[in-house]
Curated annotation (Swiss-Prot):
Superkingdom of source: Bacteria
GO biological process terms, semicolon-separated: DNA catabolic process
GO-annotated cellular components: cytosol; exodeoxyribonuclease VII complex
Keyword Hydrolase: yes
Matches recorded under PANTHER family: EXODEOXYRIBONUCLEASE 7 SMALL SUBUNIT
GO molecular function annotations of the record: exodeoxyribonuclease VII activity
Compartment(s) where it occurs, according to its Swiss-Prot or TrEMBL record: Cytoplasm
Descriptive protein name: Exodeoxyribonuclease 7 small subunit
Gene3D superfamilies: Exonuclease VII, small subunit
Organism, scientific name: Xylella fastidiosa (strain 9a5c)
Oligomeric and partner information: Heterooligomer composed of large and small subunits.
Gene: xseB
Length: 88
């Protein structure tokens, strides 16, 4: 009998799942097919998912800062994509 692997509960996987669920909720709400009660429930769930995603992104940003300079994480400067060279 094959073993089932446990679901991935890493922060990245949870973020991806939350974002996917949030996108699906928005899509369902935009169709206008939900009742008022369903729309309110979807909105409440969407807010919770948004907060989870926002918190995960903040934690990822802090982690990158700590990895960049663990002694002075607040001295990091915001990433500027225009400084990255795309030519090789």
């Amino acid at each position: 009998m094959p073993k089932h692997s446990p679901p991935d509960t890493s922060p990245v996987a949870r973020f991806e799942q939350s974002l996917q669920e949030l996108e699906q909720l928005v899509q369902n709400m935009e169709t206008g097919a939900l009742s008022l009660e369903q729309s309110l429930g979807a909105y409440e769930r969407g807010i919770a998912l948004y907060r989870e995603c926002h918190q995960a992104l903040e934690q990822a940003q802090l982690r990158v800062r700590l990895l960049s300079d663990p002694m002075h994480p607040d001295d990091g400067e915001p990433f500027d994509p225009s400084l990255v060279s795309t030519s090789q």
